Amino acid sequence: MAETKVNFSDKLDEMERIKAHSDYLRGSIVQGLADRVTGAIAEEDTKLLKFHGSYMQDDRDIRDERRRQKLEPAYSFMIRVRAPGGASTAEQWIAMDDIANTYANGTIKLTTRQAFQFHGILKRNLKQTMKDINQSLLDTLAACGDVNRNVMCNPNPYQSDVHSEINQIASAISRHLSPKTQAYHEIWLDGEKVLDTSDEEPEPIYGKTYLPRKFKIGIAVPPSNDIDVYSQDIGLIAILENEQLVGFNVAVGGGMGMKHGNTATYPQVGRLIGYIPKEEVVDVCEKILTVQRDYGNREERTNARFKYTVDRLGVDWIRNEINNRLGWQLENKRPYHFEHNGDRYGWTEGSGKWHYTLFVQNGRVKDTEDYKLKTALRTIAEVHTGDFRLTPNQNLVIANVAAHKKNEIEKIITDFGITDGQHYTGLRRNSMACVAFPTCGLAMAESERYLPSLITKIEDLLDEAGLKEEEITIRMTGCPNGCARPALAEVAFIGKGPGKYNMYLGGGFIGDRLNKIYKENIGEAEILESLRPILLQYAKERTEGEHFGDFVVRAGIVEEVRDGQTFHS
């Protein structure tokens, strides 16, 4: 049983009351779905719906016009489909494509946590969409909410035996930490209520109030830090001996979100607390999660993430508490080395099969007049006998291609003009953006719809400086919640208002260092005006192999930030 140390008092955040009285995430969601008078559901149910993998949203492009017409907002729902390690079969890809066409806005969003995301689903179609997702043997449970989210890892298990083992471990962690309530099956899959929750505890790990906030786990396999291991609540770094996986270094308390104007909130990098044998990894993840369950801040959600718990109680205290719960001591961390946190594009061979990583700008799979990416991928899925793997950088691996199928798939790629991104600049290949407008209710500025055009203008500056092939990470979010992990980028833009961004510089190319604010509340003209002299200086003064983020720190353009507690200082 989950023995939470939650003391219900008037000081607790309202969300804690909602969870406690939700009957294990049921609330009145069923009744809300049946109400045809409105396209919305009750406010409290929107908070519970997140645990089921969905957010209620509205079209912000037409919000003002609908208000003038005295109409309710154009409500719709986003659904996020979890896929541990980004794994999906060709059949599942076809199912996702069908769902996008039938119920959503005709596009698929590949997220920065290796999940599928659909936008524009109307309330009347929400249940059937959930059913169709589950019929494909994927699901949405715990894709959002105050629980462990989609577990990340290198997307290609066929790269080596170690990568295959890592994928299996990611799936095992995901299964073990999934909520056990039957509410999901009752609401979406017409399952019967299988137990009386008034007498029995159906959540042996989480308890009635689940976690104080969302919780994220990722596994990195050096030298690739593609999952941004230091951004995770639990970051696991694979340790190999003689090309065999033996265990993991464990980092705790990473996280990207903050709030503008509130210096008590900040991004943070995970802190290494030791090494564990691979056989213990699922249990260790559970024990760390329960520390956050019991000691996380349930009074103020803005300070409820595990990073704040670690900073408040101290790394040593956290390590000792984990040791006590395990009944054994974490070992000393072991050596490892990261070289990059991006994807490797094009064809590669591994485990006797071929794999093609293609560039998907900001993770949006759609057809345009000039670029039929969605149709091309559907065509590939209809002949492909392997997998589709979602990367942590919003790209896609057509994986496990049999040798006799390679030419056929290569012809489809060529016929549709699909690109692996090799002809793009290093900046564009290393870019990420969140959804932002028009569907995200938190967005303060554009992101996905704007970053590509801004990059085009920055590319002119790179060309002038002779840096067009330089690998530089650039990320943009429409708000400071950090969905595209902007605080780790060498160049980052975080929305402050319409057309205005805070600009940050100096993140580590391998994702190990936070960036620092350089300019506040600036528009495009000032962004370009600010970047030009820095890029020219970088081209002239950099040392051999020196990355842009390292240079701006060394040159004193921004201060180095290794601890989020100094992010605002």
Swiss-Prot record:
PROSITE patterns linked: NIR_SIR
Q: Which cellular components does GO assign to this protein?
A: sulfite reductase complex (NADPH)
One MF term in the entry's GO annotations:
NADP binding
User: Which EC class heads this enzyme's classification?
Assistant: oxidoreductase
The GO annotation for biological process reads: cysteine biosynthetic process; hydrogen sulfide biosynthetic process; sulfate assimilation
Pfam families, per the entry = NIR_SIR (PF01077), NIR_SIR_ferr (PF03460)
The record's keywords, sorted A to Z, are:
4Fe-4S, Amino-acid biosynthesis, Cysteine biosynthesis, Heme, Iron, Iron-sulfur, Metal-binding, NADP, Oxidoreductase
Q: Which reaction does it catalyse?
A: hydrogen sulfide + 3 NADP(+) + 3 H2O = sulfite + 3 NADPH + 4 H(+)
- Cofactor(s) it depends on: siroheme; [4Fe-4S] cluster
Q: Which positions in this protein are listed as binding [4Fe-4S] cluster? A: 434, 440, 479, 483
Function, as annotated: Component of the sulfite reductase complex that catalyzes the 6-electron reduction of sulfite to sulfide. This is one of several activities required for the biosynthesis of L-cysteine from sulfate.
Q: Which family does it belong to?
A: Belongs to the nitrite and sulfite reductase 4Fe-4S domain family.
User: Assembly state and interactors?
Assistant: Alpha(8)-beta(8). The alpha component is a flavoprotein, the beta component is a hemoprotein.
In Swiss-Prot or TrEMBL terms, this protein is called Sulfite reductase [NADPH] hemoprotein beta-component
Provide the species name.
Staphylococcus saprophyticus subsp. saprophyticus (strain ATCC 15305 / DSM 20229 / NCIMB 8711 / NCTC 7292 / S-41)
